[in-house]
Structure formats: structure tokens, C-alpha cells
UniProtKB/Swiss-Prot annotation:
Phosphoprotein found in the keyword field: yes
Keywords attached to this entry: Isopeptide bond, Phosphoprotein, Ubl conjugation
Gene: XAGE1A
Protein name: X antigen family member 1
Biological source species: Homo sapiens (Human)
Other noteworthy facts: According to PubMed:11992404, the transcription of XAGE1A is regulated by methylation of the CpG island in the promoter, and four alternative RNA splicing variants, XAGE-1a, b, c have been identified.
Family: Belongs to the GAGE family.
Tissue occurrence: In normal tissues, highly expressed in testis. Expressed also in many different types of cancers: highly expressed in breast cancer, prostate cancer and many types of lung cancers, including squamous cell carcinoma, small cell carcinoma, non-small cell carcinoma, and adenocarcinoma, as well as in Ewing's cell lines, in some Ewing's sarcoma patient samples, and in one of one alveolar rhabdomyosarcoma patient sample.
């Protein structure tokens, strides 16, 4: 039987700490924490949000829950602002 500690380490739960004046966003994964740089605050649909460069070619957009944003299809290049 697995110990609860081992089971918890396998979960990857991200907690975002956002601040309107911050240029960086901290994402905490249980016991580990990393900070990523904000690269821009718009996307192709001009919906308010924050694009993050997570390194290794991974980019993520965070948008308000009530907003909808048309994200580019896989393989398309997103214009940088």
C-alpha cells in the first residue's frame, strides 16, 4: 500500500499568485516553486490576459474566467507584442 506522502508527491496542483503590478508570476507545485517572466498581456483576439513563457518552447495564456479567447491552432505562430 502506498504511503500518503508518496501519493501526495505524485499530484501536480498549481497555485497561481497573481498581482496586477507584478512582472512575474509564481506557480507553486506542492513543495516546489518556480517564477516565470510575463512576456506580454494580449493575444491574437486582443482579450485581456497574460501570456507566460514557461521555457522549453512552452507558452501559456491566463485569461479571466468570464472572457473567451481564440487561441491559435497548434503549429501557428502567435504574434509577439
Amino acid at each position: 500500500m502506498e504511503s500518503p506522502k508518496k501519493k501526495n508527491q505524485q499530484l501536480k496542483v498549481g497555485i497561481l499568485h497573481l498581482g496586477s503590478r507584478q512582472k512575474k508570476i509564481r506557480i507553486q507545485l506542492r513543495s516546489q516553486c518556480a517564477t516565470w517572466k510575463v512576456i506580454c498581456k494580449s493575444c491574437i483576439s486582443q482579450t485581456p490576459g497574460i501570456n507566460l513563457d514557461l521555457g522549453s518552447g512552452v507558452k501559456v495564456k491566463i485569461i479571466p474566467k468570464e472572457e473567451h479567447c481564440k487561441m491559435p491552432e497548434a503549429g501557428e505562430e502567435q504574434p509577439q507584442v
